[in-house]
């Protein structure tokens, strides 16, 4: 199928990006999903610093590539081997899909899946290869197996988390990275326990969710630190939100 997407073809554009326009909106061709893949109509896509790191070249990825890994959408087509999803399901995307078979997955560390990391670094899905082509038939890479800065995207079953339809999809998109990364850093990496004292440095999207993750974990004292003048509204959110 054909749709539009934000394609990055070169890195190192000058800032501000609003003027240099490093992304081009192009018509792309999506191949049908494989047996363990789904086709999703994109509802929301956040701009994460990881996207900016690909644009400025500090996070090397094969080019060209369709960016976007923090998003949400509605499933419109399901691969033949998938039995636990249905068309019309609302979903949030996770950029850390797991194969369930590699050493890291078997050790209980699916978020560090070796297969997903290897294929993602090559701009491919876990089933191998890309499902994206440009108007001339040339291959375009996937970003973290997601590429949600587009009207539609094909991704692995492991990248899909079904959410209740009562949750607005535009809001749910943030769970795909900012919420998962911030709360996960506190709960899974730092392993904060009830009564612990926690300091969070920086109150962007990830930091705010780190604070909320610390509260969820039962931290006895939470210290939020940010020197940016624009952070005052974030402090208000933490006080009264």
Segments (PLM) and residue ranges:
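Short structural boundary motif marking the start of a folded domain
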Residues: 1-6
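Mid-domain Rossmann-like dinucleotide-binding core that forms the NAD(H)/NADP(H) cofactor-binding site
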Residues: 151-152, 158-241
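Cysteine-cluster motifs in flexible loop/terminal segments that predominantly coordinate metals
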Residues: 95-158
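Short polar catalytic/cofactor-binding loops
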Residues: 8-14, 45
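Short Gly/Pro-enriched turn/cap motifs at secondary-structure boundaries
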Residues: 18, 29-31, 62-68, 140-145, ...
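Glycine-rich beta-strand-centered segment in the early N-terminal region that forms part
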Residues: 29-45, 55-106, 111, 119, ...
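Short gly/ser/thr-rich secondary-structure transition/capping motifs
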Residues: 19-25, 56, 143
